[in-house]
Amino acid sequence: RLFNPRRYNPDEWAELARAAGIKYVVFTAKHHAGFCMWDTRTTPFNVINTAYGKDLTRPLAEAFRRQGIAVGLYFSPDDFWWLNQHGKPINRAPFPGVTPQELPELMAYDKAQIRELLTGFGKIDLFFIDGPAEGLRELCWEIDPDIVVTRGAIETPEQFIPGLPLSGAWEANLTMGTEWPYK
């Protein structure tokens, strides 16, 4: 199917979020498939090269910021598109040989994308790294020492709430259904 979110309206979303008392939003800038929801210079596999042809990340960040809501971005360092383009198996850790920590070229690619996201979209309050964060979280803190980084300073148990308090800051990472994708 053709990706063309013609009814995308981040201003409406932000107004509803403010009315609901939401304090922060986390937008998926890049998931495991590697598709980038912003106008990146790092890859042609991005929203600009779709029928929609416009950045989705910038208007969302601006809309939520106007409503006084903190802006977070979700970023997967696992990038199936990149792995495929470089003849690597499409998989995630703990599968060996597919993480940025094992592939210097993928680490450089991820870092370039993180630099774009943390320097080109105004203040980003939270950066959610969904995967091995070593080398990436440090870059986030180098760019903005005050940014909150998951898998860096906050643990994010997935699809459950721990029975006992965790030792540090944490946030339960739950879906509204039984799966991560929309159904």
Protein language model annotation of sequence segments:
Residues 1-183:
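Mature catalytic domains of secreted/periplasmic carbohydrate-active enzymes
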